[in-house]
Amino acid sequence: MGSTMEPPGGAYLHLGAVTSPVGTARMLQLAFGCTTFSLVAHRGGFGGVQGTFCMAAWGFCFAFSVLVVACEFTRLHSCLRLSWGNFTAAFAMLATLLCATAAVIYPLYFTRLECPPEPAGCMVRNFRLAASVFAGLLFLAYAAEVALTRARPGQVASYMATVSGLLKIVQAFVACIIFGALVHESRYGRYVATQWCVAVYSLCFMATVAVVVLSVMGHTGGLGCPFDRLVVVYTFLAVLLYLSAAVIWPVFCFDPKYGEPGRPSDCPRGSCPWDSQLVVAIFTYVNLLLYIVDLAYSQRIRFVPTL
C-alpha cells in the first residue's frame, strides 16, 4: 500500500485562523458585515453620496475580510509577496475607521424612530434600525482585532502593528477628510498661503501612504538607511509642516482681513465655503495632534520589517 506524506509545514489548513481570539473577531466581522450589507440592500435602503459611501465601505471591508480569513485558513498568505503582518494590521485599522464612519453616517441620515408615511414604512424603519445596530457591532469587531493584534511593550512585532504604524493609517484617513472638504467649495485657491496649506496636506499624505506601502510590501530593508530612523525624521518634518498649516489656514480663512470670522447668514446649507473651511481647520489640528503623538511613540519602537 502507498503511504501519505505530511506537508512539510504542518497541516494544510490552519484552524487557529478561525478559533483563536483574532480569528473569532474576524469571523464576527464576516457575520456582522454580511448582515449589515444585506439588511440595507434588502429593505433598509440607501441613497445619495452618504448611503453610497456606507455601502462601499461595508462591501470593501467584507471583501478584504474574506480574503484575509481565506488566506490565513489555507496558509496561502505565505505565497504572497508582501508582509502579511503589516498588511493585516493596516487593513484592520483602515476597516475600523471606515466602519466607524459608516456606523455614524447611516443612522444619522437614514434612521428615524418614527415610521415613514409609505405603506411599508415601519418595516423599512425596523430594517434600518437593525442595520444601524449591526453596523455598530461591525465597528466593534474590527476595533477588537486592532486591540488584539496591537504590539505590546517589549513584543517583537511588525511596524504596522505598533502605535506609530496604526497612527499612519489614521493620519491618511484624516487627510482624506481634509481633501474632501477642500474640493467642496473651500476656496483654497484665493491666497498663496492657503495653497501652501494644501501642499502641506498633499505632501504629508503621500509620504504617509509611501510609509504604509513600503511596510506592507516588505521593502523597508532596502532603503539604504534604517527605516525607523527615516520614519522619525519624516514625522518630525510633518509636525513642523502641519504646525505651519495650523497657523496659516485659520488666519487666511477666519481673520476679518482675509475671510469671515463667523458663518455668513446667507450661506446655503450643504454648499457653504465657510463650513468647508471650518472642517479643514478642525482636522488640521486633529492631524497635527496625531503626528505629535506619532513622533513621541516613534522614539521608542523596535519592529521587525519581515513579519
From Swiss-Prot:
Keyword check for Cell cycle: no
Cystine bridges: none
Pfam family, one: MARVEL
Subcellular localization: Membrane
UniProt keyword terms in alphabetical order: Membrane, Repeat, Transmembrane, Transmembrane helix
GO CC annotation: cytoplasm; membrane
Residues in MARVEL domain copies: 17-154, 159-303
The keyword Transmembrane helix is assigned to this record: yes
Membrane-spanning ranges: 53-73, 90-110, 129-149, 163-183, 198-218, 232-252, 278-298
InterPro entries referenced in this protein's UniProt entry, alphabetically: Marvel, MYADM-like
Membrane protein topology class: Multi-pass membrane protein
Domain of life of the native organism: Eukaryota
Main location group: membrane
Similarity remark: Belongs to the MAL family.
Protein name listed in UniProt: Myeloid-associated differentiation marker-like protein 2
Organism: Rattus norvegicus (Rat)
Upper taxonomic lineage: Eukaryota, Metazoa, Chordata, Craniata, Vertebrata
